[in-house]
Regions:
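Single conserved hydrophobic/aromatic residue that forms the stacking wall/gate
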Residues: 145-157
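Short, acidic/hydrophobic/Gly-rich beta-strand patch recurrent on exposed beta strands
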Residues: 18-22, 89, 101, 157
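Intrinsically disordered, low-complexity linkers and terminal tails enriched in Pro/Gly
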Residues: 133-148
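Structure-specific DNA junction-binding interface
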Residues: 1-76, 82
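Residue-level recognition of specific faces of alpha-helices
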Residues: 1, 70-76, 87-88, 100, ...
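Amphipathic, charged-and-aliphatic alpha-helical interface segments
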Residues: 50, 57-62, 82-101, 122-133
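Nuclease catalytic cores that cleave nucleic-acid phosphodiester bonds
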Residues: 104
Length: 157
């Protein structure tokens, strides 16, 4: 659906930004790391993850692909929702979080608000083999490749 938003930063707060694209302001929930990356800028390109539920359509924005990929891995863990994943990503930069997970440091994860011992262990067990600190996985690398719409359509059809 929406891969990214590019436009003027209309409003920027530690937990959310409004990106004006074509006269429409999109409210995008962000981590503190993305907030820091956007500070002082008038325009931005924010990578997006959409969460479409029965009661809400919520956009999550990321300054880079590594953060978005980690967010998607985190929300795939049972018991970790989008809000908790955003808090985790606000607590550590991507390199540090990857190292914590790869190293099995449950104590560090438990220090994050909303993460208990069982959830910390589940994150480590579920993601340890999927994360190599400093490296993008094959799926993450493929998500960086731009495929034109006609090509994408012919691949899907």
């Amino acid at each position: 659906m929406i891969e990214y938003l590019e436009g003027r930063i209309d409003s920027l707060q530690p937990a959310a930004a409004v990106i004006d694209t074509g006269g429409i302001g999109y409210l995008v929930n962000i981590s503190l790391n993305t907030y820091e990356a956007l500070q002082g800028r008038e325009r931005a390109r924010v990578l997006v993850h959409e969460s479409i539920r029965e009661d809400a359509w919520v956009l999550y924005g990321f300054a880079d692909e590594r953060e978005r990929a980690l967010f998607r891995l985190l929300i795939g863990v049972s018991g970790v929702g989008a809000g908790t994943a955003r808090v985790v990503l606000s607590s550590y930069d991507t390199a540090r979080l990857e190292a914590i997970i790869a190293g099995g440091d449950a104590k560090q994860l438990k220090s994050v608000k909303g993460i208990g011992a069982k959830t910390a262990e589940r994150i480590i067990v579920d993601l340890r083999d999927k994360i190599k600190p400093g490296e993008l996985t094959l799926i993450q690398q493929l998500s960086l490749i731009h495929i034109s719409e006609p090509t994408r359509h012919s691949l899907i059809s």
